[in-house]
């Protein structure tokens, strides 16, 4: 009686690992689609603030969602401000005003000062 052929073990139910590269019919390997995220930048800031602290992938996902949400809110508000003033360009002034409108009190002040510092650093490096 012939032995049953051994195949690769089936992936566990609920396995989160995706197949890295799937084989196409013509033998070429398909590239994995790239997911854009802010995780690299969140990690860099975390290491500046707390060098000995790590972050879980779930927490990183939450931080990524948070940054995307704040970005969309600021961009939307800045767009509205530009439209109200019959402007077709969003400048740092619209962004600054949007931040002042969206963020509460002291948080807005700190965000504006950090933003101004970043813009100054960027323009001086050009």
From Swiss-Prot:
The modification N6,N6-dimethyllysine is found at residue 58. It holds the Pfam family Histone. The keyword DNA-binding applies. Residues 1-12 have a biased composition (Low complexity). The modification N6-lactoyllysine is found at residues 6, 12, 16-17, 21, 24, 44, 86, 109, 117, 121. PROSITE patterns: HISTONE_H2B. The modification Omega-N-methylarginine is found at residues 87, 93. There is a cross-link at residues 35, 121 (Glycyl lysine isopeptide (Lys-Gly) (interchain with G-Cter in ubiquitin)). The modification N6,N6,N6-trimethyllysine is found at residue 86. The modification N6-crotonyllysine is found at residues 6, 12-13, 16-17, 21, 24, 35. Residues 1-36 are annotated as: Disordered. The modification N6-malonyllysine is found at residue 117. The modification N6-butyryllysine is found at residues 6, 21. It comes from the Eukaryota. The modification N6-methylated lysine is found at residue 117. The keyword Acetylation applies. Monoubiquitination at Lys-35 (H2BK34Ub) by the MSL1/MSL2 dimer is required for histone H3 'Lys-4' (H3K4me) and 'Lys-79' (H3K79me) methylation and transcription activation at specific gene loci, such as HOXA9 and MEIS1 loci. Similarly, monoubiquitination at Lys-121 (H2BK120Ub) by the RNF20/40 complex gives a specific tag for epigenetic transcriptional activation and is also prerequisite for histone H3 'Lys-4' and 'Lys-79' methylation. It also functions cooperatively with the FACT dimer to stimulate elongation by RNA polymerase II. Glycans are attached at residue 113. The modification PolyADP-ribosyl glutamic acid is found at residue 36. Belongs to the histone H2B family. This is Histone H2B type 1-D. It comes from Homo sapiens. The gene is H2BC5.
């Amino acid at each position: 009686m012939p032995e049953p052929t051994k195949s690769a073990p089936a992936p566990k139910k609920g396995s989160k690992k995706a197949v890295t590269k799937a084989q196409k019919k013509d033998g070429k390997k398909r590239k994995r689609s790239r997911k854009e995220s802010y995780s690299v930048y969140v990690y860099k800031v975390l290491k500046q603030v707390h060098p000995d602290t790590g972050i879980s992938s779930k927490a990183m996902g939450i931080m990524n969602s948070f940054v995307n949400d704040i970005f969309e809110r600021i961009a939307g508000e800045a767009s509205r401000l530009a439209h109200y003033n019959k402007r077709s360009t969003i400048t740092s002034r619209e962004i600054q005003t949007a931040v002042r409108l969206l963020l509460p009190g002291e948080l807005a002040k700190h965000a504006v000062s950090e933003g101004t510092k970043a813009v100054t650093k960027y323009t001086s490096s050009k």
